[in-house]
Amino acid sequence: MAFDPLSLAYHEAGHAIVARHFGCELIDIFISLDDQCGGATVTVCGLNEWQKGLIALAGCAAEVLAGHAVADDPDRAWEYLKDANDAQQAVGEITGLDIGDDGFRNAYDALEAEAEELIRRPPIWSAIVALAAVLAERHAVDGATAMSIIDPILSGFADHSQGASAPQPELSGTA
């Protein structure tokens, strides 16, 4: 099964740009068109659970915003499930709630809405578009190349400098 390179590229670019926004060093980003991997973004940094959840949800959010989402494609369902599981783990760590507890879904939805809002910020979205274009063409980008593409775009973004020490918002699990 071959996947759409632009869809995969937006997905991985979403993860990479949000990770970079939080101060992560990008090591490698790649997409794979014909295996079950789909792609991966490899980073080095210390993150809090909130940031990990935002990064996990940013991939699908970027794909949807770009109009390339294939979330209902059973061949890619595992990829979305892994990201959702990572975000659920983050919500559990933040709130102390288990997936079936009252309020868990509200907290998850709040994290998801924040990821969607974050990638809509013009510098972040511009960086996602720029990196996705390169990824769709090359299928792999090393971290230094990726950062040389996106850092000039993000440098004008006021809160990009907050890095990995960004405060964690309160996700109480209630709406």
Walk through the language-model features, giving the residues of each.
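Soluble catalytic regions of large protease machineries
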Residues: 2-175
